[in-house]
Amino acid sequence: SIPSISAAYDARLQSNNQYTTKTSMESIDEDISDKNLSDALYFSRVCSMIQGLELITKFSESENHEISIVEVLENWRGGCIIRSNLLLDLKKEFSENNSFYSLDNIFNYLQQNRAAISKVLQITTKNNIPTPVLSASFNWFNNLTSVDNPSNLIQAQRDFFGRHKVQKVDSSEDINIDWD
C-alpha cells in the first residue's frame, strides 16, 4: 500500500482541474509555525520513502528479483535527483534491521513528530486547504501504529454485507452482528 505516493499522483492529476476555487491564505485565522510545517513535510517524506521502498521489496519478492534495499538506497544517494540525508538514515536502519517494521529510529522520529503534522492538518482542514499527501502519510502512520484501526471497520462491513463474522474488542468469540 502506497497511500502517500498515490495521493501525490492524484494531486498531480487534479492540478489541472478546471473547477478550482481560490482559498486566500490571508483568510486563515491561525498561523502554521515554520517548525510544524517543516516537521510535517519531513514526516510525509519519510512515510513516502518507506512506502516506496516497501513497494520495491514486494515487487522484488513477487518476481523473485533479489533487490537489495540497501543497494537501492546507495544508488539513489549517488544519483542526481534524490541526495537526501534521509537516504543515509534509511540505509543505516535497513543495514541493521532489513525490515520495514523494525526501523526503530525512523518510527520513533515519526512518533515524535506526529503532533506537528496533526497540527498542520487541523489548520489546513479547518481552512479547506487540501493536503492529500500529508493526510495520506498521517493516516498511513496512524493505521500502522494504532490498535483500533480501519481494519476493524472493514471486518464490520464484511459482516454487514456477507455475514463474515467479527470479533468484538471485549470478546475472543467470532460472531455475526444483527445489523437490522
Question: What spans do the regions from the language model cover?
Answer:
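C-terminal substrate-binding/catalytic lobe of Rossmann-fold NAD(P)-dependent dehydrogenases
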Residues: 1-124, 131
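C-terminal amphipathic alpha-helical interaction region
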Residues: 111, 116-180
